[in-house]
């Protein structure tokens, strides 16, 4: 359980940043996480945002560890507010066909719309995710560019460059798959 919780937490903040940020704010690590990083049950939007975050992280893990996509982890990190979700395509993953990562038409990008629910009585998240995934064609380019910039800000220059490859589909075609999860 501890390893899984640590994995989830690292989607929000890196170890070294957590220690520094907690110290600068005069807080324990646990207090800093509760007050500044992880959405909490007793806060407005906290349960909804946390449910969405966890569902997105699980989908990221599925794409990365089961289907072998590279999945940028940027959405939960350094938010302007812990209960503020990023807009756009929920999860993107990519694969390069060529080991040198030279663009080919066999490269793959998967754009996934994710929906979560907080109650047992609502069983329609997948239907909502499928409906929302149809909007992704219009917002995917903005999401890829935002992801590229966020990765660069987070110091992940290599992955930022890899993601940029998927910006200009007409110039560098690739296989694109839209998916939904809920």
Question: What is each model feature region?
Answer:
Residues 98-107:
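Short, solvent-exposed loop/turn segments that connect beta-strands within catalytic domains
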Residues 91-93, 110-116:
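Conserved catalytic cores of phosphodiester-cleaving nucleases, focusing on short active-site segments
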Residues 66-84:
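A short acidic/basic microdomain associated with nuclease active sites
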Residues 57-66:
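Amphipathic alpha-helical segments that form well-ordered structural scaffolds
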Residues 69, 97, 117-120:
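Short loop/turn segments at secondary-structure transitions that flank enzyme active sites
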Residues 83-95:
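Charged, often glycine-rich, active-site loop that binds/positions anionic groups
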Residues 120-182:
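Acidic, metal/cofactor-coordinating or nucleic-acid-engaging core segments within structured domains
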Residues 1-57:
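Interdomain/boundary linker segments immediately adjacent to catalytic/signaling cores
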